[in-house]
């Protein structure tokens, strides 16, 4: 019989335990991220009424995690309670770093831009420890801002041990990259109060190519029934394909279907969620979404040959999360009398604004294209049909980590207003 040395046995047990701990942490973080995503989305639906909506939960959570690095006392407790984890934990930091690295992989056919910028009042003395941590945080930067003159900021991000004093004009799109025009709007929104301020700006944009592209020649102008019962004509994409599909029920026994369309490389997928009954309002499904339901999709989707009808849509939303996050438990950070960011500076900072800007475009191939003009007659098929011809939810998820990059709804595909 082969006998392993004691040292080898110890190493084996250590590797098994480490693997178990990593898997346990990954499962826990996945559920916490999903819970936060749903809570954030459901809170936004209460204020956005029946309009198109999109939000990037992973981008917002990244911003709150950055604030955690400098928060103390009850401010830290609220941020930790909302996210469900403390980023000061080394294991959590490692997990988040790996997750960001996985999502940052811009391969052929996929482009993802995510930034988080912390604007801090010019002249405030920052603690070197915080600037060092912030510089190591994925896709983030700390920038000087003159809140008394909204069109003046400081161009260079903070580096550990250095202060920047040069001012510059915040050009349109300077914060948001390709989200043109947003920079000036963000600058104008900054205002000077009685205490030094922090403004948090995060932006995210995605463009991807389908694993199996829709043919432009199959796109037709077809009816789409709005929530008020009115019918409009929209550009409806079509393809026959084998996809992941499942039927589910909410806690109140309302039936709904989930269709999953992978992007090129299969690291990301778009999940389209549609009430099975036409009379079921989308708001009813939105209110009953839970992390457990989303987890059940992973095991409940089956490969199915289907005829797929999906409207082409494009949307962009801008939010000041200052009016949203208190409902999720983050209030002290925005309160000049209660905020505790002594891990950033000893000069009494608070968050004046938290801007979130996000956009998405879904077309036949994932890129901008002119509308197809040809009308096509499609042959009859015995395959099941998934037809998103009424309001629906969508989630763009990272397959490996389960992170929800985007979550939103399409109430009117023809409405492209931001």
Regions found by a protein language model. Give the residues of each.
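Secretory/exported precursors with cleavable N-terminal leaders
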Residues: 2-418
């Amino acid at each position: 019989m082969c006998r392993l040395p004691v040292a080898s046995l110890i190493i084996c047990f250590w590797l098994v335990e480490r693997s178990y701990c990593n898997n346990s942490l990954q499962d826990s973080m996945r559920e916490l991220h999903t819970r936060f995503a749903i809570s954030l989305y459901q809170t936004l639906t209460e204020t956005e009424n029946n309009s198109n909506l999109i939000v990037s939960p992973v981008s917002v959570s990244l911003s709150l995690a950055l604030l955690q690095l400098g928060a103390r006392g009850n401010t830290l407790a609220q941020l930790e309670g909302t996210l469900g984890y403390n980023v000061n934990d080394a294991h959590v930091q490692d997990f988040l770093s790996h997750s960001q690295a996985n999502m940052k992989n811009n391969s052929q056919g996929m482009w993802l831009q995510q930034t988080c910028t912390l604007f801090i009042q010019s002249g405030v003395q920052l603690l070197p420890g915080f600037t060092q941590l912030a510089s190591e945080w994925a896709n983030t930067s700390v920038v000087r801002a003159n809140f008394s003159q909204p069109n003046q900021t400081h161009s260079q991000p903070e580096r550990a041990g250095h202060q920047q004093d040069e001012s510059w004009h915040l050009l349109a799109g300077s914060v948001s990259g390709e989200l043109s025009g947003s920079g000036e709007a963000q600058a104008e929104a900054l205002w000077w109060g009685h205490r030094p301020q922090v403004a948090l700006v995060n932006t995210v944009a995605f463009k991807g190519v389908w694993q199996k592209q829709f043919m432009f020649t199959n796109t037709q102008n077809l009816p789409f029934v709005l929530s008020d019962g009115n019918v409009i004509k929209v550009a409806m994409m079509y393809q026959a394909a084998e996809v992941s599909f499942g039927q589910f029920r909410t806690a109140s026994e309302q039936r709904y279907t989930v269709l999953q369309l992978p992007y090129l490389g299969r690291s990301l997928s778009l999940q389209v969620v549609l009430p099975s009954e036409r009379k079921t309002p989308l708001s009813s499904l939105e209110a009953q979404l839970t992390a457990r339901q989303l987890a059940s999709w992973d095991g409940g989707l089956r490969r199915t040959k289907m005829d797929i009808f999906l409207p082409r849509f494009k949307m962009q939303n801008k939010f000041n999360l200052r009016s949203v996050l208190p409902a999720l438990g983050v209030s002290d950070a925005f309160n000049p009398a209660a905020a505790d960011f002594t891990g950033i500076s000893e000069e009494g900072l608070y968050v004046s604004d938290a801007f979130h800007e996000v956009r998405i475009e879904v077309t036949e191939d994932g890129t901008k294209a002119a509308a197809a003009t040809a009308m096509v007659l499609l042959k009859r098929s015995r395959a099941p049909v998934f037809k998103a011809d009424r309001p629906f939810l969508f989630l763009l998820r990272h397959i490996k980590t389960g992170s929800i990059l985007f979550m939103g709804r399409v109430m009117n595909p023809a409405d492209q207003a931001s």
